[in-house]
């Protein structure tokens, strides 16, 4: 036996349930026009089975009970009136008699309507071309089906008409597939029986097609009414994405409270409900059945509000109306107005829950002469409004030109219209429209859990704190959202009571109760509209419509009734008295059906006032709530409260105004007097009805003794709480910024909760797409504009790692212009909404097709095939190499920092479905200032990206970066890493490996293509040794590169070597050799650059122990052999090399992360030295405007420790400190922290180019010092020229191993002097050198016999000459003049500007923190030097070593660092905003110095943050002062207005008194005159 259902007596709808009730249903033709005056509505008993996802309409309630016994779910009845099926046919029969000898469609004559007929009901899928017979189920006509047998009148149809067709399904059984195709329409009931014998006319093929193809013919006779296909019809709601439910505006169907079920095989049906609450519950139940988990997913809610006001410059004496279309779909229609002196509609349209649209179209029509039967309406023109123009916070009001499709006539008029296309522009017809499109990004409801809890517990404190600082519009929005949210939570009464009590205590004056615009009044208005709309219509519809339809005149002001007699004035006064009495009687009688929710709320008001001892204010408060804020405004403007559909006439408006004025005076318990003395004839009515008014207020504010059971229509569960919480998040985030900091702390932890939600939106909570839910990228800004991002759901791309697959769904956002980086789209520049930026929609959208911001999407389809091929290759290559890390978890959300300067920049995740990217304010993935979090994209899929050129002047500065914490967490979770990608686009062609931050003219093609499997092999973290390896891409030397880009473009011509390598390496745009591409003959055999700081220690020890220098050539040869052997060994072991991890900033303030490394370069960017002598594979310095030039001078060198020893020491250091690696340095503080955490195991690094403001990094500080120390040991002379001027935005740098970075891009390399800000500080270092000086860049002059690149020899003669002169000037500060056995000078020079010197150190402890030698005391080192050293200070080697005064050097360094410390303290704010221009110094760090430096770095960062916070507080205080001043002025104005009103009233009273006195005086005068004549006759 089946299970029984039970009728739910509760006031809630639980899922799943059986929802049922009577509805008026209409199913219209797709081409139905206005020739049909009445729509075929009919009552049907509708049943929604939420568990089965079916929506069935029955002709009777009894038939619907056939399947009740088989279910065990609650039943909920929504209709208010139990009605029979046959009693309420409110229209003509739905099936009109068809004359067999005519071809007329509905209406009888004329056939199909002309092109000027306006479609009454259009579908949202009109492009499908639906055709159907009015007696058949709606089908989609397929032009490919031309079989005439499908359209023939079959014998089964004849049997149906005779009633002899078999009844196939049993009543009550579930019908799924058969119902969609075989059910007949329910609108065929009670149709006239058609005589089959009359069907004698032959029907053409075209007419048969029009009648419909497929499906069964419906019943044509009364005998077959009992068959199941004639008494029920079912809609399957399980078609996800194909079936939708939406409310329908009353102007479309001519009925209130309608909704539409669109999609599915049957097309569209319209349902009319008895009230708005009933309609909302049906829509909620249907949507819940379609998508039960919608509230737990990320979604977007779109709404549109429009006001169509007036038109001008249209031909007069015509009747006009407008139709509102959203993407060619009819959503509303205005009333018909006659053009006289003014053509004014003034109608408001609210379209909630609309899909994503592109264009708003307003079509203007006019009625033609009645004699013309065919064309009753003529198209005048249209107004097209792009959606992105009306997405601002406030509604946008504007005059729009009415444009016609006709070329010669802008009005589309006939010859008698009186206009032509040559009309002046001033006479162009225009339409005044105000509209606002709002898109709300809604996160899953669980994300708002803390926010909802806070609001429920602290709404009173929030309202009290925000009240003084927010405007009227914000009060209205916040109040409405809070009311809806609290009503859904069952706290509306308590919420309103608390906020109203606050308002009463603040105002104090009883006469001003609810007179202002406060949160309390706006919240009360929202609650009244929410719960009392049906009550308002039931109460006031009859008297208002009667007053509007009647032509009686109620004007009683003598000044406005000039020429009227006293009799007519009395008649008008009597008419007004009757209208007022009728309206008041309806209101008084309405207490019988007064809403229970409002009654409870008003009862709570009375109880709270009694507790406060203000019982005297109860009646005033309740009357102000119900009359001042609800009933009287509804009488005054009935169209705003949906009582009428259009504005009443001028006379009716005046009548309604007088009625509302009288009722409001009655509710205030006052009398007419003063300036409204013409209304004094109603004072007797006011006195008589005052008692009844008090009785009415008492009744509606008293809880009944026997409360009625809760009605299902009062259930508030249908309210979308996620939408209201999203709106409140946006509004409160904006409002809190207006508060002073002290007041903000009063609302703690509200700011923290709001920030968490903002981060959740930026991280990208799951978004519902066909492929699943995806993490969405977003910009650093939240949705005050809402919004919002432009997404296009696409297919998911897959990637197989080892034996598992993970899907990465994607989104597509609005592509940015190629000439700029847009950090945040303005609210007015929102663009097209999410989900509609597809090439197909853009081709149809004339407003966006030529927009440069969407060119990338128009090319998206052409690029998808190429991306799929590349990703397949990546997948195959990846399986060959294999993953070292096997994922065991789903991908987490992107971990983003809270700071705007540390949010991930444009992150691209490309898969076969399209391109995903986001807008960001910063240029690279970065961490917050404290380095606690970072933003690393992670994924298993190889991503191929589209190249795009960005203008260098639009590049924002790069933030400080720290990634070790996230890398460490992700490594523990076995998540591989994706490469950092700022606002750079990575090319999809494997051969092009260059930075894409600036325009380039070079040839992107390479001699040899790098395998596509290396597209993402840019950086890895070694699990065994804790080494974060950074893969550096090579440079392209083949193409001429003469652009202004300061970043090198390099290329590889190698083939794969087959070695397995790490698949996740951070690519920073510098040559790479750590993996599977090895070219033995290109390896540098003579590179002796150290791999880490331990190599420097070896050099120091070696310099102390050996007093005799070896010959230069011999040493260089031996060292080259050692380094050659030491390099080949680690090259075969993937993941064990320490590359240049510290100079990670690329040009233009961006970090370019390439997925195509060029392994032709050596594994260290500072180790190659003889590349210039080896062939044509040298990578030129493609610098247009270099400020850094490293001059190579070949010569003698000293040997460093072998690479094997270096690798062992390096691995030990990495095992000890690997868990705290911070591989990317973005600033001085972050770089120091990275250096300390890494345990000193850093490599030599390069000075990377930059074209933004200066920001020196301690990462390069150390790494360049390593290069300099090694370079001091050999005969290679490096010159680090830095010439920076204030505001300079171009500087370049190169690797210390400048031999393989040879040629400059054909530009002048002369250093620019800095004028008065120039400062030259020269620190000399000998061979081995003092550790205090080793870290500085070396500057040497060219020596004879040493190899140098010809470009550098040509470009730098002046610099070399200046260098030699400065060497002579600063000899006394040089540590050792003799550098090596060669005949080269090793005097070191460092030239700095004061602007850049401030970033070298935070305090004097920097020297102690990084120089072990200086910490150990004033120990002097005996330095050996050649007798041939140029410009030596002493006559012999021993004399030169003894003459070195290290104490003076320490003092000089101390003074310099103190100066730099003061400079840093003075310019901290500028330091924070500076970009990533790097110039590094390095000294070996000791343990004590490291601790001191860490503490100093933290204190410095705290001071910077404190100063920034102080500045922000000052700005907020200024804003608060301005706001308070403005509020004060507003209050003064309001008070003055009240005083003026009081004075006006006093003047009126005085005038009345004077008038009375005058009348009395005149009366006395007349009496005296009557008595005076007898007395004056006596003297005569």
Curated annotation (Swiss-Prot):
Biased composition, class Basic residues, residue ranges: 940-954
Domain annotation C2: ranges: 282-400
Transferase is among the record's keywords: no
Polar residues compositional bias, start-end: 776-805, 1140-1150, 1186-1206, 1396-1415
Name of the featured protein: Ras GTPase-activating protein raskol
Residue ranges annotated for the PH domain, each copy included: 233-291
Region Disordered, residue ranges: 197-223, 764-819, 857-892, 904-1023, 1112-1218, 1284-1313, 1334-1443, 1561-1580
GO biological process assignments: negative regulation of Ras protein signal transduction
Composition bias, Low complexity: 806-818, 857-885, 926-939, 987-1020, 1151-1169, 1207-1216, 1285-1299, 1351-1362, 1374-1388, 1563-1580
Biased composition (Gly residues): 1427-1438
Additional free-text comment from the UniProt record: The name 'raskol' means 'to split' in Russian, and is based upon its role in maintaining cell adhesion in the polar and border cells of embryos.
Subcellular location: Cytoplasm; Cell membrane; Apical cell membrane
Role summary: GTPase-activating protein, which acts as a negative regulator for some members of the Ras family. Probably decreases their signaling activity by stimulating their intrinsic GTPase activity, thereby lowering the levels of the GTP-bound active form. Functions with DE-cadherin (shg) to promote embryonic border cell (BC) migration and adhesion by regulating the distribution of actin protrusions in BCs. Promotes shg-mediated adhesion at the BC interfaces and likely maintains BC cluster adhesion during BC detachment from the follicular epithelium and subsequent BC migration.
Site positions for Arginine finger: 515
Pfam families on file: C2, DAB2P_C, PH_RASGAP, RasGAP
Gene Ontology terms: cellular component: apical cortex; apical plasma membrane
SMART domains: C2 (SM00239), RasGAP (SM00323)
Domain Ras-GAP: 490-700
Biological classification of the source: Eukaryota, Metazoa, Ecdysozoa, Arthropoda, Hexapoda
Biased composition annotated in UniProt, kind: Basic and acidic residues: 1363-1372
Topology class, membrane: Peripheral membrane protein
Modified residues (Phosphothreonine): 167
């Amino acid at each position: 036996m089946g299970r029984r259902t039970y009728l739910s007596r509760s006031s809630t709808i639980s899922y799943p349930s059986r929802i049922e009730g009577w509805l008026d249903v209409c199913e219209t033709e797709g081409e139905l026009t206005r020739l049909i005056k009445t729509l075929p509505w009919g009552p049907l008993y509708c049943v929604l089975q939420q568990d089965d996802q079916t929506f069935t309409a029955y002709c009777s309630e009894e038939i619907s009970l056939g399947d009740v016994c088989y279910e065990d779910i609650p039943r909920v009845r929504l209709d208010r009136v139990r009605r029979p099926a046959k009693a309420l046919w409110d229209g003509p029969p739905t099936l009109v008699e068809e004359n067999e000898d005519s071809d007329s469609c509905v209406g009888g004559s004329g056939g199909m309507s002309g092109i000027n007929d306006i479609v009454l009901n259009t579908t949202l899928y009109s492009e499908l071309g639906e055709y159907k017979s009015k007696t058949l189920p709606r089908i989609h006509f397929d032009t490919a089906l031309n079989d005439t047998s499908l359209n023939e009148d079959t014998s089964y149809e004849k049997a149906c008409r005779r009633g002899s067709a078999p009844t196939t399904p049993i009543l009550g059984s579930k019908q799924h597939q058969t119902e969609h195709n075989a059910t007949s329409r329910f609108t065929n009931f009670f149709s006239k029986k058609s005589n089959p014998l009359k069907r004698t006319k032959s029907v053409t093929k075209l007419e048969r097609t029009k009648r419909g193809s497929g499906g069964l013919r419906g019943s044509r006779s009364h005998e077959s009414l009992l068959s199941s296909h004639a008494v029920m019809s079912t809609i399957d709601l399980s078609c996800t994405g194909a079936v939708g439910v939406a409310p329908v505006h009353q102007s479309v169907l001519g009925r209130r409270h309608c909704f539409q079920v669109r999609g599915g095989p049957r097309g569209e049906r319209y349902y009319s409900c008895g009230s708005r609450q009933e309609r909302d519950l049906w829509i909620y139940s249907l949507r819940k059945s379609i998508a039960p988990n919608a509230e737990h997913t990320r979604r977007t809610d779109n709404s549109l509000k429009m006001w169509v006001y007036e038109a001008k410059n249209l031909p007069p004496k015509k009747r006009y109306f407008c139709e509102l279309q959203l993407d060619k779909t009819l959503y509303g229609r205005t009333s018909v107005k006659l053009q006289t002196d003014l053509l004014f509609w003034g109608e408001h349209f609210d379209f909630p829950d609309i899909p994503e649209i592109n264009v708003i179209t307003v079509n203007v029509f006019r009625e033609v002469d009645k004699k013309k039967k065919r064309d009753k309406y003529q198209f005048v023109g249209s107004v097209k409004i792009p959606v992105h123009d009306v997405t601002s916070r406030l509604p946008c009001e504007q005059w729009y030109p009415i444009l016609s499709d006709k070329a010669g006539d802008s009005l589309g008029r006939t010859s008698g219209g009186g206009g032509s296309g040559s009309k002046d522009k001033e006479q162009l017809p225009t339409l005044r429209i105000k509209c606002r499109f709002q898109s709300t990004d809604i996160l899953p409801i669980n994300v708002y859990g803390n926010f909802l809890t806070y609001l429920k517990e602290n709404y009173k404190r929030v309202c009290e704190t925000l009240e003084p600082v927010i405007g009227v519009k914000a009060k209205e929005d916040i109040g409405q959202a809070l009311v809806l949210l609290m009503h859904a939570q069952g706290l509306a009464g308590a919420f309103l009571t608390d906020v109203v009590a606050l308002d009463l205590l603040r105002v104090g004056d009883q006469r001003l109760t609810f007179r202002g615009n406060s949160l309390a009044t706006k919240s009360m208005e929202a609650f009244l509209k929410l719960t009392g709309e049906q009550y308002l219509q039931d109460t006031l519809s009859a008297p208002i419509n009667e007053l509007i339809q009647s032509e009686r005149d109620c004007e009683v002001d003598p000044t406005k009734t000039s020429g009227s007699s006293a009799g007519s004035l009395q008649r008008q006064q009597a008419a007004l008295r009757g209208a007022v009495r009728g309206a008041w009687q309806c209101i008084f009688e309405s207490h019988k059906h007064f809403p229970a929710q409002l009654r409870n709320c008003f009862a709570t008001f009375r109880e709270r006032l009694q507790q406060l001892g203000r019982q005297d204010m109860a009646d005033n408060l309740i009357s102000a709530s119900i009359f001042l804020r609800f009933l009287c405004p509804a009488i005054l403007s009935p169209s705003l409260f949906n009582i009428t559909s259009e504005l009443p006439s001028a006379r009716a408006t005046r009548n309604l105004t007088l009625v509302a004025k009288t009722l409001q005076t009655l509710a205030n318990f006052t009398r007419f007097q003063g300036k409204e003395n013409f209304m004094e004839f109603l004072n007797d009515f006011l006195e008589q009805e005052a008692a009844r008014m008090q009785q009415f207020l008492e009744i509606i504010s008293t809880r009944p003794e026997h409360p009625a059971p809760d009605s299902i229509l009062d259930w508030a569960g249908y309210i979308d709480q996620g939408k209201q919480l999203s709106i409140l998040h946006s509004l409160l985030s904006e409002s809190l910024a207006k508060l002073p900091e002290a007041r903000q702390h009063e609302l703690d932890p509200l700011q923290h909760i709001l920030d968490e939600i903002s981060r959740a939106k930026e991280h990208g909570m799951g978004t519902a797409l066909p492929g699943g839910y995806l993490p969405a990228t977003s910009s650093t800004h939240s949705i005050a504009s809402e919004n919002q991002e432009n997404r296009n759901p696409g297919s998911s791309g897959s990637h197989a790692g080892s034996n598992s697959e993970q899907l990465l769904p994607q989104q597509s956002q609005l592509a940015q212009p190629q000439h700029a980086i847009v950090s945040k789209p303005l609210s007015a520049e929102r663009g097209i909404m999410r989900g509609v930026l597809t090439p197909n929609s853009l081709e149809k959208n004339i407003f966006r097709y030529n927009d440069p911001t969407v060119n990338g999407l128009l090319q998206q389809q052409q690029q998808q095939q190429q991306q799929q091929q590349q990703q397949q290759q990546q997948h195959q290559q990846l399986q060959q190499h294999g993953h070292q890390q096997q994922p065991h978890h789903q991908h987490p959300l992107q971990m983003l920092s809270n700071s705007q300067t540390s949010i991930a920049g444009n992150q691209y995740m490309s898969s076969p479905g399209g391109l995903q990217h986001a807008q960001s304010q910063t240029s690279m993935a970065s961490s917050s200032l404290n380095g606690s979090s970072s933003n690393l994209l992670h994924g298993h899929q190889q991503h191929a990206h589209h190249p795009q050129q960005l203008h260098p002047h639009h590049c924002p500065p790069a933030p400080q970066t720290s990634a070790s914490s996230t890398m460490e967490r992700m490594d523990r979770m076995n998540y591989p890493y994706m490469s950092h990608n700022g606002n750079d686009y990575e090319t999809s062609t494997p051969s092009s490996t260059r930075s894409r931050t600036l325009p380039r003219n070079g040839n992107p093609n390479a001699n040899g293509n790098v395998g596509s499997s290396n597209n993402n092999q840019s950086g890895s973290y070694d699990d065994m040794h804790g080494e974060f390896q950074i893969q550096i891409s090579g440079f392209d030397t083949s193409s001429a590169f003469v652009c202004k880009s300061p970043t090198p473009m390099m290329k590889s011509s190698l083939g794969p070597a087959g070695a397995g390598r790490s698949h996740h390496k951070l690519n920073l745009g510098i040559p790479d050799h750590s993996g599977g591409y090895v070219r033995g003959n290109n390896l540098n055999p003579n590179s002796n650059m150290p791999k880490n700081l331990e190599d420097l220690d070896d050099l120091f020890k070696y310099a102390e122990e050996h007093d005799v220098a070896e010959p230069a050539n011999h040493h260089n040869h031996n060292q080259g052999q050692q380094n050659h052997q030491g390099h080949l060994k680690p090259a075969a072991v993937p993941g064990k090399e320490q590359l240049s991890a510290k100079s990670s900033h690329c040009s233009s303030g961006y970090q370019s992360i390439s997925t195509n490394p060029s392994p032709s370069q050596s594994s260290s960017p500072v180790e190659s030295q003889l590349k210039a002598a080896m062939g044509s594979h040298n990578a030129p310095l493609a610098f247009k405007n270099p400020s850094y030039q490293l001059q190579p001078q070949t010569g003698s060198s000293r040997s460093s420790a072998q690479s094997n020893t270096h690798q062992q020491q390096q691995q030990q250091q990495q095992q000890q400190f690997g868990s705290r690696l911070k591989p990317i340095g973005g600033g001085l503080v972050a770089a120091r922290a990275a250096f300390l955490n890494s345990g000193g195991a850093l490599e030599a690094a390069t000075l990377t180019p930059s074209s933004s403001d200066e920001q020196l990094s301690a990462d390069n500080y150390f790494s360049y010092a390593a290069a300099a120390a090694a370079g001091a040991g050999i005969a290679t002379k490096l010159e680090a020229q830095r010439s920076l001027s204030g505001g300079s935005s171009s500087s370049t740098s190169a690797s210390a191993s400048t031999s393989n970075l040879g040629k400059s891009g054909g530009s002048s390399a002369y250093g620019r002097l800095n004028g008065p800000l120039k400062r030259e500080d020269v620190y000399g270092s000998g061979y081995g050198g003092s550790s205090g000086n080793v870290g500085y860049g070396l500057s040497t002059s060219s020596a004879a016999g040493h190899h140098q690149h010809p470009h550098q020899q040509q470009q730098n003669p002046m610099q070399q000459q200046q260098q030699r002169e400065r060497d002579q000037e600063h000899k006394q500060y040089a540590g050792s003049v003799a550098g090596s056995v060669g005949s080269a000078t090793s005097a070191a020079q460092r030239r700095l500007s004061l602007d850049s010197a401030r970033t070298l150190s935070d305090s004097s402890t920097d020297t102690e923190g990084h120089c072990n030698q200086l910490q150990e005391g004033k120990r002097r080192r005996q330095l050996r030097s050649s007798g041939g050293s140029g410009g030596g200070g002493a006559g012999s080697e021993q004399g030169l070593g003894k003459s070195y005064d290290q104490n003076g050097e320490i003092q000089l360094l101390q003074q310099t660092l103190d100066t730099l410390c003061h400079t840093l303290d003075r310019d901290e704010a500028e330091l924070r905003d500076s970009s990533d221009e790097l110039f590094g110094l390095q000294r070996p760090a000791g343990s004590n110095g490291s601790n001191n430096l860490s503490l100093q770095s933290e204190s410095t960062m705290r001071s910077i943050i404190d100063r920034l916070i102080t500045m922000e507080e000052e700005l907020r205080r200024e804003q608060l002062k301005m706001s308070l001043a403005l509020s004060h002025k507003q209050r003064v104005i309001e008070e003055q207005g009240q005083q003026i009103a009081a004075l006006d009233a006093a003047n009126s009273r005085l005038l009345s008194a004077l008038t009375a006195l005058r009348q009395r005086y005149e009366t006395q005068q007349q009496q005296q005159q009557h008595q005076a004549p007898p007395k004056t006759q006596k003297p005569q």
